[in-house]
Amino acid sequence: MKRIGILTSGGDAPGMNAAIRAVTRTALANGIEVCGIRYGYAGLVAGDIFQMTSETVADKISRGGTFLYSARFPEFKEEEVQLKGIEQLKKHGIDALVVIGGDGSYHGALKLTRHGYNAIGLPGSIDNDIPYTDYTIGFDTACNTAMEAIDKIRDTATSHQRVFVVNVMGRDCGDIAMHVGVATGADAIVIPEEPYDIKEIAENLKQGFANGKKHGIVVLAEGVMDAEKFKDELLKYGDFDARANVLGHMQRGGSPTMRDRVVASEMGAYAVKLLLEGKGGLAVGMENNKLTHHDILDLFDAKHHGNYALYSLNKDLAK
């Protein structure tokens, strides 16, 4: 193996640049050349590929987003499009590939592996929704961003004795909502994986005000319901003032936390180690604080298991 490529695909996540840096410098330290591929699989097919050096990744570890840029490219599901990507890999002498992203990115990596190219997937997703890893790159930063925002929201909620329904990211996974809910002392956490009783939530909020509380915070995962709609439903059972707030894409931005930088660096270096061993078609993970890898194909039949003990814990702490 003389040259590897690296790309980021799908939604960006803080820490991706740290992973790119680790892959690049680990490969170079082992005598392997590195090519960066801009704009994910779309850039691969278009041939937007360039040589990377140690200097290319200098001063990138603290930056949010991905300096290789990203793009969603559903067309890569088609065999004809995949073959165009293969042509570009051959043209640039790329022997193997590291892909950083989520579910769609892993599907692309699997397709390339089936075409004879060793590909390794790194879990880059703020949602923490990828199986066989306790932790995805970007999750910690997103949680800290949401936590800081909710701390500020609580200030104005207290000033006006209001309830705020705060929408956080997590279409199918409530990990951000659970962690941030506990960290901010939320009155309720609402996630896709658990049933909820909106009337009960309203009653608990009313009881809180009756007991002297000056605010109410409901952390709502985006996959459950629109925040405005949830707020309106809540007001059917409560006589308090309420507002909805959608944190949105701010959770994807910002300088990555220490944890995201370190984990991304460890995963990036581990991906190169696997490629040096001639392995491919694998997804890197962090399980019980240890680096692991699994066949990418296994991920598609598996389900991410969040720390639902946090959900139960918050119910007790919010009383």
Swiss-Prot record:
Mg(2+) binds at residue 103. Its cofactor is Mg(2+). It catalyses: beta-D-fructose 6-phosphate + ATP = beta-D-fructose 1,6-bisphosphate + ADP + H(+). Allosterically activated by ADP and other diphosphonucleosides, and allosterically inhibited by phosphoenolpyruvate. Gene3D superfamilies: 3.40.50.450, Phosphofructokinase domain (3.40.50.460). The keyword Kinase applies. Substrate binds at residues 125-127, 162, 169-171, 222, 243, 249-252. Homotetramer. This is ATP-dependent 6-phosphofructokinase. It comes from Lactobacillus johnsonii (strain CNCM I-12250 / La1 / NCC 533).
